[in-house]
Amino acid sequence: MGLSRRDCIKRAAAAALWGCVAAPLAAQAQTARPVVLIVGDSLSAEYGLKRGSGWVALLEKKLGAEKMEASVVNASISGDTTAGGRSRLPALLAQHKPDVVVIELGGNDALRGLPLDMTERNLAEMVRASKAAGAEVLLLGMQVPPNYGRAYSDDFASLFASVAKDQGAALVPFLLEGVANVANAAELFQPDRIHPRESAQPLMLANVWPVLERLLK
């Protein structure tokens, strides 16, 4: 049975409407940029630094220079611990839907002498939650002075590799490689000897970039 003139008009209008809706959706899908979510503490939150000079800000500039389309969300909070990051993460995952989650936490746990098994559990859960949300994960390792004994500091340094291996995350073994373990380290830190100066930020990015770049390709 043939279509009436009214039916033809309705179908033509519906097709035109769908075309108006589908075209922007297709364009949006083509231009969607990967999202990199940074969940860290003061080392990633520009503590004591001029705004825009931290390693995360330098990462954004690096992505632009490399013509890599990606958005960076810096959800770092000075003083945060792995427990704090773990509690904040679900909402961040839901809000930003990241493609890569970079976890830079644990240093404040160790400076407070918190139980290492708790730190390890928190990091592992953060990796699992991020992967369950469909994101790749990059864990940034940290080391601390032996304030609580050599065994504590050694075990702390090794737990990042353990979590990365067990949970299938990428790893930068030591974020402050070439900063904290060099002869001129004092020149690269602020007077508190905990937070790196602006001059150290490119070195930190240089440690992160090769691993992160692979995750974004």
Where are these regions (language model features)?
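N-terminal secretory signal peptides and thylakoid transit peptides that target proteins
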Residues: 1-17
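Membrane-interface segments of envelope glycosyltransferases acting on lipid-linked substrates or membrane lipids
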Residues: 8-11, 32, 40-41, 199
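C-terminal segment of classical bacterial N-terminal signal peptides
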Residues: 20-26
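Serine-esterase "nucleophile elbow" of acetyl-processing enzymes
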Residues: 28-78, 88-97
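Acidic/histidine-rich helix-loop elements
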Residues: 48, 73-82, 111-114, 193
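Alpha-helical cap/lid subdomain in secreted, periplasmic
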Residues: 62-64, 68, 86-217
